[in-house]
Amino acid sequence: MSIQEKNAHIASFAVAPAPYIADQATAEEFMRKSYSNRLTSRSLSLIHTVFSHPSIKKRHFAIDSTDTLVNEEPDARMARFTQWSVELSARAIQKALARAGLSVGDVTGLVVNTCTGYICPGISTYLIEKLGLSRSIRTYDLVGSGCGGAIPNLQVAEALLKGGGGGVVVSASVEICSATLQMDNDISLILSNALFGDGAAAAVLWEKPEGLEMVASAGRYVPEQRDTIRYIHKNGQLYNQLSLKLPQLVNKAAAAVVADVLKSHSLVVKDIKHWAVHTGGEKIINAVRDEIGIPEERLSATRKVLSEYGNMSSPTVWFVLDELLQQGIAPNEWCVMLAFGAGLSAHAFLFRKI
């Protein structure tokens, strides 16, 4: 049996950014107008520095207007998370299925991940209802993987496809980072509010040897470093916590997981022409680039997505892969999807274009 017959394939995928677009100058103005009464002069100066950084031009948010975010009550925030996590993931799934020439009736499995909100029953049940998926579909809702969550999701979806005797499995990642917006003089919050946005993505997996061959994957966990990047609970709400040491920690985990996934197929970094690297911020991207030895020209898609969308947490790597496909991936060329985040963790998936 050939490798193509053994491996699952990504038939298609699609992205769905949130509808409200704000450039960084507008976002900075909103922060100053809404929170200056609780911020120190040092924090206000830092806001200007980080919001005017040239690496990010604009971001997308799941809101109707910025007024939504001011003094948003927890119940209203969770309702917004629920509404938009379902809406954006549904859009991505519908687009991805259409691109593969499939319908909702073809879907036999669904895996959904998020880290920016918790609802029970999970997002998958809302999608069954909204999209008209089979009531006997196999579904899994994953939480807690942070920005790296798309790849563990893919691993579960791949196992679901192989273990279920084929069919069509959908892998959906959605984050409403604005549903965790908080602001005070904590540098973690200031940095987060300049970096994160909202969006969703979905991939369609099947066994046909068409699309992107799912060749190998790997993950690395450093649990003793979990406090360097995580959500913490305060008064029943999520607060993002980021360490300034992250670039020097993430790069090591990222390099290790890339080495693992390449070694499994006797490949080296120079064999990989396409890199879908998570947009964790310019310093982290640079640190990962230097530690792994990725040529800067191979990061143009990551830089572009960072500029136009910021960091949307888990679905972001799909936006980068979408940009790579638009740039062009030739048959038999290798691509590595690389994501990292809470855990501290790093995840990689090796693809080959069919």
Residue spans for each PLM region:
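Condensing-enzyme catalytic core mediating Claisen C-C bond formation in acyl metabolism
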Residues: 1-82, 168, 177, 181-252, ...
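Claisen-condensing/thiolase-fold acyl-transfer catalytic domains that form or cleave C-C bonds
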Residues: 3-4, 90, 116, 129, ...
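Conserved beta-strand elements of the Class I
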Residues: 9-11, 108-111, 168-170, 273, ...
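Conserved beta-ketoacyl condensing-enzyme motif
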Residues: 48-133, 144, 269-285
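Short, well-ordered amphipathic alpha-helical segments that serve as non-catalytic structural scaffolds
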Residues: 52, 85-100, 200, 249-265, ...
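A short glycine/serine-rich beta->alpha loop
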Residues: 75-81, 112, 139-142, 188-190, ...
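Secondary-structure boundary elements
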Residues: 98-104, 160-168, 205-212
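Acidic-glycine-rich active-site phosphate/pyrophosphate-binding loop
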Residues: 119-133, 172-182, 226-231, 285-299
